[in-house]
Structures are given as C-alpha cells and as structure tokens.
Design a protein with these regions (language model features):
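Contiguous beta-strand/loop segments that form the cofactor/metal-binding neighborhood of enzyme cores
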Residues: 1, 5-82, 103-117, 148
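A generic "alpha-helical surface" signal
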Residues: 1, 100, 124-127
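C-terminal helix-rich "cap/oligomerization" subdomain common to oxidoreductases
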Residues: 44, 111-149
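A short, structure-level motif marking secondary-structure boundaries and short turns
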Residues: 50, 94-95, 119-122
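A short glycine-threonine-serine/GTX helix/turn-capping micro-motif
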Residues: 91-100
Length: 149
C-alpha cells in the first residue's frame, strides 16, 4: 500500500538502509487490517523511524504529518503545507501551498530520460524499501521484528 512511500521518505531522511522492521495493527484480527498500523524501522546507521498509518482518525486532522527529531532540534511538517522548527536557530515557521514534489520529480525524470544521468532514486534504495515493505507484512504475521535482507 501507501506505507512504502513513507518508508522511502524515512530512508531518505535517515540517509541509511532499513535493517529491521516491526509492524503492529489495531483490532481483534490485525492480520486483516493494514489500514491502522504502526511500523517501527531500524536503520543501519542507528537511526529509528516510526510510521503511524491510521485511517480511523478525524477528517479534520491533518492527513499527513512528518516529525523529525535530531541533535536537540525538531521539525514538524503538516500536510506538506506548514513547516515548524523548534530549537532551529533562525527558523520557526514556513507556510505555503501543498507540494509533494510530483511536478519537480517528473521534470527531473524527463530531463534524465532526454539527457541521461544518474537515477533520481538509487536502485539499491528502491530494493531496500521494497524488501522493508514485504518484511512489514511478515512482521505483522509473526508478531515480531523481521530483518530486512
């Protein structure tokens, strides 16, 4: 599903490969409910990431929220429209229109196809995200951490 996009984003922010995952779902029969899950990601460089993917919340709350904690600083991105910084010298808030980067991504892809050059996303990263996604389903079934190989 859509969780792979968030795994990919976390991997980009961590600048590392996922080495283990643990996924837990809500409900009495969680194996059949992947619309309400928490995914824990462990990275090769020691970074941890948590993805909470819930379809049972209020529609009035932001649909997508990213929080990054590092070196006594926090960045919070709400719906790709508002970015707030805490403990970031000289920065507190930025707002704008929603931009998930699709237009720029396709412009860069078109440029690469016409002129050549490196892939926008390294193949190894795509493979790691795919393996991590499959490992999430395995983790849900096993109710345990699963290594990503």
């Amino acid at each position: 599903g859509e969780a792979c996009h968030f795994i990919d984003l976390c991997s980009f922010l961590a600048d590392s490969k996922v080495v283990a995952v643990c996924m837990n779902a809500l409900g009495e029969n969680p194996q059949e409910n992947t619309d309400n899950v928490s995914i824990l990601l462990k990275y090769e460089n020691g970074t941890n990431a948590v993805i909470n993917y819930f379809a049972n919340g209020s529609k009035s709350y932001v649909k997508e929220r990213v929080e990054v904690f590092s070196q006594e600083k926090v960045l919070v991105l709400d719906n790709w429209r508002k970015l707030e910084g805490f403990g970031v010298k000289g920065f507190s808030k930025m707002t704008g229109t929603m931009d998930k980067g699709h237009k720029r991504q396709f412009a860069l892809l078109n440029e690469r196809l016409q002129k050549g050059g490196e892939a926008l996303i390294p193949f190894e990263s795509i493979v790691n995200t795919t393996r991590a996604s499959f490992a999430c389903i395995e983790s849900l079934k096993k109710k345990a951490w699963v290594e990503v190989r």
